Amino acid sequence: MADVIKLRKGLDINLKGKASMDVTLQVEQTEEYALVPDAFVGVTPKVVVKEGVHVNSGDALFVNKACPEVKFASPVSGTVTAIERGERRKVLCVKVKADAEQQATDFGKKNVDVLDGEAVKNALLEAGLFGYINQLPYAVSTTPDTKPKAIFVSALRDMPLASDFEKELEGNEDAFQTGLTALSKVAKVYLGVGIDQHSRALEEAKNVEVNVFDGPCPAGNVGVQVNHIDPVNKGEVVWTVDPSAIIFFGRLFLTGKVDLRKKVAVAGSEIKTPGYAEVLVGTPLSAFVADQLKATEHVRLINGNPLTGVQTDMAGFVGGHTSEITAIPEGDDKDEMLGWILPRTSQFSTSRSYFSWLFGKKKEYDLDARVKGGERHMIMSGEYDKVLPMDIFGEYLIKAIITGDIDKQEQLGIYEVSPEDFAVAEFVDSSKLELQKIVRDGLNTLRKENA
């Protein structure tokens, strides 16, 4: 029987517009797809194709400059139409015009039961899928020279408006199990599931240790699960893998081909019919989101969930780790009489400043993107600890990162954290600090120092 880990710290934020499991959204046929390097944190891309070249799905579009073995596969077959660059020639995306009849590079079917760890890694490297594996410390895309003491997969997505992985798992059970079995050849695999998830593919997963997490957000964060099961110390490495990527891996071993289809939630109060769309990595958002928006102005479109996602627009694409596209009010057209002084019941408050807490925890809120205040000194103490279910002193770690005290950061557990672990803390922070950016900057600095 799976171990149940009860977490008490955290905060569930119920927003209007959660995607319905029963609604399947139409995806318009599109010719152009794009692979975005920024979706793979820590990767400096080196483009290995030229405009006008024809590629098959599974062929590399770019590699990790620091480790050229790590390739990133094209989601479709077609002609490379553009390599878009930004400031200082930064690669923004590689665009491919899809063929009418798709062709995939055949890497050969493999029986994962007879493979060893090196064979699994080599197969993922060859097919351009290895870069979907992240690591702690530093919360970046990993490289094949790392030796993980364990591999963590969290099937629990509990951020506001997050997609339900059980929806994506439907019809992909065999691929999911195959992917888990493959990774178990590299290191011990821990699968984290939620107390309310009852899919047999999760509860009865083989070749892994299943742990059930019962608690508020961010219980589904893989970093939180690592902290409670097998914390990362200096000099140690664990791999963390998105469950969607596990399905990608499984399909590769079962079919010998790269198949980057996934079910993405389209959610938020600004969406007409919140539901799920089956898309490829690299699909333009305009193909399945444009017709679903209630309005085109005063709307914040987010590639991801409202707490950890990235602001985008209709020119954006589904990222390698995207599991939901959300749309919430921007809030720039609001004119509230008396501001926060006016008593109200429709606003969310963790400190019970409004009467909305009387309606219970299940009340849904239509929150907008406003910060409602400027950055200020850290005066309130203990705010982070109430919503950070990890065995670290979050407030002191943030202060150590701000002051650049690397020794103190290491003592306070920076190797165990990733930016999204502080997403809820950032939401409740009365100092209005960008905690996720602070943590990311600290991890980047530490990574350079230890290189």
Tell where the protein language model's regions lie, with residue ranges.
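Mobile cofactor-carrier "swinging-arm" domains
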Residues: 1-15, 81, 86, 94, ...
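N-terminal, Lys/Arg-enriched amphipathic/low-complexity engagement segments
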Residues: 1-48, 63, 213
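Short, solvent-exposed loop/turn positions at domain surfaces
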Residues: 43, 49, 66-69, 273
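Short, well-structured beta-strand-loop connectors
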Residues: 49-63, 82
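Glycine-rich, histidine-containing beta strand-loop boundary motifs that form or position
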Residues: 59, 65, 76, 84, ...
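Short coil-to-beta-strand transition motifs
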Residues: 69-77
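Buried, small/hydrophobic-residue-enriched core segments of structured protein domains
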Residues: 70, 84-451
